[in-house]
Every structure is written in C-alpha cells, then in structure tokens.
Amino acid sequence: MDMRTSFLCVTYVILLTGSACGLQITSTGQTSIEKASGESVKLDCQFTLASDDSGPLDIEWSLQPSDNQKEEKVVIVYSGDRAFEHYYDPLKGRVHFNSPDPKNGDASMNIMGLKATDTGTYQCKIKKVPGIASRKYLLTVMVRPSKPKCSAEGQTYVGKNMVLKCSSVEGTQPMEYIWERTSGNKLLPPLAILDKVTGTMTLKNATGDASGTYRCQAKNRVGTEECVVEVTITQPPNTAGIIAGVIICILLLLILLALILFCCCRARHKKKYEKEIAYEIREDVPPPKSRVSTARSFTSVGSQRSSLGSMSPSNLHEYSKPQYDKIPSEEYDRPPSHAPIPPPSRMAGPNLSRMGAIPVMIPAQNKDGSIV
C-alpha cells in the first residue's frame, strides 16, 4: 500500500508540472484602460507555448457585449499562419496585430484613432491544443473637453453682483471647472462663490479690486481646455442727471409739437379768412351788361333815325359822335362808378345842326334798363 500511494503521488505531481508548463499568457499590468478619443491603444497579450502543445495555433480578439444575451463580436483573427483583420466593420482599417508574426508569442492588438463608440470589453483568446488561455481588457474611450466659452453676465458696477460662466459643449463626464485669476494679486475676490460642476463663479457685492483677467479650466481624466474673460468694475452712472436729461428732451419735444400744431392751425384759419373775403367782394360787384342787349339798342335806334327828322328840335337832345378809336371792351369791363353823373348841357336845335349833330330819338327806359 505504501508503494502504491507513492506512485500515485509521483504521477499527480508530473501531471501538475506539465499543466503548469503548458500554454500561458504572460502579460501583466492593468486590465482597465482609459484613453482619449483620437489616440491609439495597445492591448497587450504575450504568451508562451509548451512542448506538448502540438495543435494549430489560433488567436482571436473579440468584443464582449454589455448584454449577456447578445453574441460577442469577433474583431481580428490569426489562424493557419494568416491574419484576418476585417471581421468587425466599425474597426475596419483601424485594428491590426502588433507583431507581423503573432506565432512568435506576441498576440497583442493595436487600435488606431479611438472613438467613443470603441468603449467595451475586449478578450484575447489563444488556443493550441491541448493548451487554451485568455485575457480581458476593459477599454474606456473618453472625449476631451472642447474649447470652453467664457462670459460675464450682470451689471459691471460697484456694489452689484456679477456671474462668470464657463461651459464646454463636448467632454466625457465627470468634468469639472476651475476658475483662477491671472492678473493683479492672482487671488479670487473674498466674496466669490464657485461651482465646479456648472462652471459658474458669482462675484457678490463687486468692488473695483475685482477687476482683472480670469481664466477657466475645463478638465476631465483625459484632457484640459481653458478660456479667459476680462472683468471691469466701474462706478455706477449718475441716474439723476440721466432722468433730468430725459425729462428736458420730452418737454422740448412737446413744445415743438405744440408750435407745429399752432402754425398749422394759424395757416389754415388765414386761408379760410381769405376765401371768405373773396366771396364777399364778388357778391358786391353787379354783373356786367350784356353786349348783345347793347347792340340791339343801337340797332333799334338806327332803324328809327329816319323818323326823327320831322320831330321838333326842342324835343331832341344833343348827340355827340362816338369815338371809335377806343376799345369797347374797356367800357364794358370797367366797374361802375359811384360818382354822380353831371346832367348834359342843353343846346338849341339850330346850333346843333350847324355843329353837324345828328338828331336821334332816345327811347324811354324803365329802371332795369329795358326799352319801353
């Protein structure tokens, strides 16, 4: 029984020794890696083979799904002394083996131009029958903070509150904002309130000493970006003078409007008065005599000339020869005169005949000027 027990122990030790000296992955170090987008990463997978590993060498890198119910995605494969690097379309052209001949013991994988979508768990699996070994890496691709934008909000007067803001559009959380002063004594105002999460700094009851240049840094675990802002605290303006000036301007404007309205009303009243005077003048002037009626009166007088010769000279009035060199229109267009007309002088009939006068009969007329 003692010899049999000793034989079994020796056999067991030999088997354990052979197993320990078989296929092994010798890479060490962190299995959780954080990288910034745009960088490259090397997932190390060094291995050694045992003398009894006689089967074909197969190397496979795969992306483990976050959900256990999903299948893993094969990324890159080495089999039959050939490398196949186009299995996974999202990493196509950006992934390859670190060694041109992985069978020499280097199955490490390089990923170029990292993206945030490359985040995941990657597994290196090496198989050479009867040996099998694997190693996993948790890769986290983080986005650097984008260039932050600094701004100042609030009144820049002494005794007022001002808020300095800093914000990055892109960047993987957690991300914090740090404010510092780069001018003067480089110390923040004593009443400054910082918020590292939102990136705001409130300057309460600001004084002239708070004026200067301030810098904000946006940072996370993979990068840092910054921006600056100038702050100038001044004395508040004289509001009483501004109010007085506004009131004076309003009064001047009202006076100007009143003058314009007064001038318009005066001009309108004057024009209306002139029209009324013109209407009164036209009503006082009698209408001119008709030329047709005057011509008819001369015609009737001429037709009766022959019968006037037998009338006695005492019944005749003198008749002077009309002057034809004057324009008749002037006589008709001339307004009537209000001066009294002197009575015509009487002369004897024989004297009138010697003077060449022609006796005419003047028909009687009524008040409106018509012949009776």
Swiss-Prot record:
> Known Gene3D superfamilies for this protein?
Immunoglobulins (2.60.40.10)
Location comes to: Cell membrane; Basolateral cell membrane; Cell junction, Tight junction; Cell junction, Adherens junction
Please list every transmembrane segment annotated in the UniProt record, as residue ranges. Answer: 242-262
How does this protein sit in the membrane?
Answer: Single-pass type I membrane protein
Query: By its UniProt entry, which Pfam families does this protein fall under?
Result: Ig_3 (PF13927), V-set (PF07686)
User: Hey, which stretches end up on the Cytoplasmic side?
Assistant: 263-372
Keywords, ordered alphabetically: Cell adhesion, Cell junction, Cell membrane, Disulfide bond, Glycoprotein, Immunoglobulin domain, Membrane, Receptor, Repeat, Signal, Tight junction, Transmembrane, Transmembrane helix
Disulfide-bond pairs as recorded: 45-124, 150-227, 166-216
Q: Which gene encodes it?
A: cxadr
Instruction: Tell me where the signal peptide lies.
Output: 1-22
The residue ranges flagged as biased composition, category Polar residues, are: 291-317
Give the species.
Danio rerio (Zebrafish)
Subunit info here reads: Monomer. Probably homodimer formed by 2 molecules on adjacent cells.
- Which superkingdom does the taxonomy of this entry point to? Eukaryota
List the biased-composition ranges (Basic and acidic residues).
318-336
Please describe what this protein does.
May function as a homophilic cell adhesion molecule and be essential for tight junction integrity. May also be involved in transepithelial migration of leukocytes through adhesive interactions with jaml. The interaction between both receptors may also mediate the activation of gamma-delta T-cells, a subpopulation of T-cells residing in epithelia and involved in tissue homeostasis and repair.
- Name the SMART domains on file: IG, IGc2, IGv
**Domain commentary:** The Ig-like C2-type 1 domain may mediate homodimerization.
Q: What is this protein called?
A: Coxsackievirus and adenovirus receptor homolog
Q: A GO term (biological process) for this protein?
A: kidney development
Task: Please indicate the ranges of residues that lie on the Extracellular side.
Answer: 23-241
Chief location category: membrane
Q: Tell me if Metal-binding is a UniProt keyword of this record.
A: no
